[in-house]
A protein has these predicted regions:
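Sec-dependent N-terminal signal peptides
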Residues: 3-13
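Glycan-recognition and catalytic cores of secretory/periplasmic carbohydrate-active enzymes
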Residues: 17-322
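Short loop/turn motifs at secondary-structure junctions
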Residues: 2-3, 49
Length: 322
């Protein structure tokens, strides 16, 4: 429960003029039955024969065999994250066991030992599908989401080892140390012989999946400084591109942060997430620039990408044409 209350305090402190009215914000415990129900559904997707959780399932929890029986990396990590949070809210030990199953499958089958980094997709039997495919920052970051949550809940040193192994792999292979273009590259070849591009995913998803959690868990200045660098990337490049767009910001970049104008889609959830991350970082490393940018990002969605009749933000826009 305390994590919900901490989140509400963060929101109220960052945007003090807002008075929550939702019953789920006023009493976060109301959300626990929903979390319990969601987690219970996904327990049925576990493969008790070969381990891991299927990726392609229908609304009833049946595997959609025609789509493939693959068990994608981020399915395992996100399932582990969800199960851990459900355990922390409900105390249901079975959810922690399910999270353990997901991570054990990842550790056994999704890590590329010869080259470092995580494979994108695994077949039912634990073999990597297309092991020489590109490795993306999106996958490398999200692989750490469930591991970090499990370590937070249990302090299991084995999971810490895998968490740091994954983090160091991204630092060694995806981080661009150039003072003029620092940031995470968006993708690399399977053996990391070539890396390229920058993106929203490579930048902002690093915060939510691992860097923020690592700083909260350790207080280590290594992760604090990384948060500052990623916040600078948001301010300089994502937020910095907003004034020249009809809506949203540039999401795809060349390696030197020049815009990739072959991709003009902007996603409202990404704009909101960037503001959310700046707000979270501001709670730990106060900077008025973070708050000002967060307010502008949220206002852009509310003013230009929000359904004021039925509620909720729209999803995708062309940033140039609106």
């Amino acid at each position: 429960m305390k994590y919900f209350y901490i989140f509400i305090l963060i929101i109220n402190a960052t945007f003090a003029q807002y008075v929550p009215r939702s019953p789920y914000l006023l009493d976060p415990s109301k959300a626990i039955p929903y979390v319990d129900s969601c987690a219970d559904f996904w327990t049925g997707v576990y493969d008790s024969t070969f381990g891991g959780f299927y990726t392609n399932v229908d609304r009833y929890g049946n595997v959609i065999v025609s789509w493939g029986t693959n068990k994608d990396l981020i399915t395992q990590s996100r399932d582990a994250y969800g199960f851990v949070r459900a355990y922390m809210l409900t105390g249901n030990q079975n959810y922690l066991t399910m999270a353990r199953h997901a991570l054990d499958f990842m550790y056994a089958h999704a890590w590329d030992s010869p080259h470092d980094g995580w494979y994108h997709s695994i077949d039912r039997f634990g073999n990597p599908i297309n092991p020489t495919d590109v490795k993306t920052a999106f996958d490398q970051h999200y692989a750490l989401l469930g591991i970090a949550a499990y370590y937070e809940a249990t302090r299991d040193t084995n999971d810490w080892t895998h968490l740091i192994q994954g983090y160091n792999s991204s630092e060694n292979h995806l981080w661009d140390n150039d003072p003029q273009s620092f940031g995470y590259f968006d993708n690399g070849t399977y053996d990391w012989s070539y890396v390229s591009d920058k993106s929203f995913n490579a930048t902002v998803d690093a915060i939510t999946t691992n860097v923020l959690e690592l700083y909260l868990l350790t207080g280590d200045n290594v992760y604090k400084n990384k948060l500052i660098q990623l916040a600078d990337n948001i301010l300089t490049h994502l937020y910095g591109s907003m004034s020249q767009q009809t809506i949203g910001f540039v999401e795809e970049y060349q390696s030197d942060w020049s815009w990739n104008n072959n991709e003009t889609m902007t996603i409202m959830g990404h704009v909101l997430k960037s503001g959310w991350c700046l707000g979270r970082i501001n709670q730990l490393i106060p900077d008025p620039a973070y708050v000002n940018a967060a307010e502008d990002l949220i206002a852009d969605v509310y003013n230009n990408g929000y359904d004021h009749e039925l509620g909720g933000p729209y999803k995708d826009f062309n940033r140039v044409t609106g």
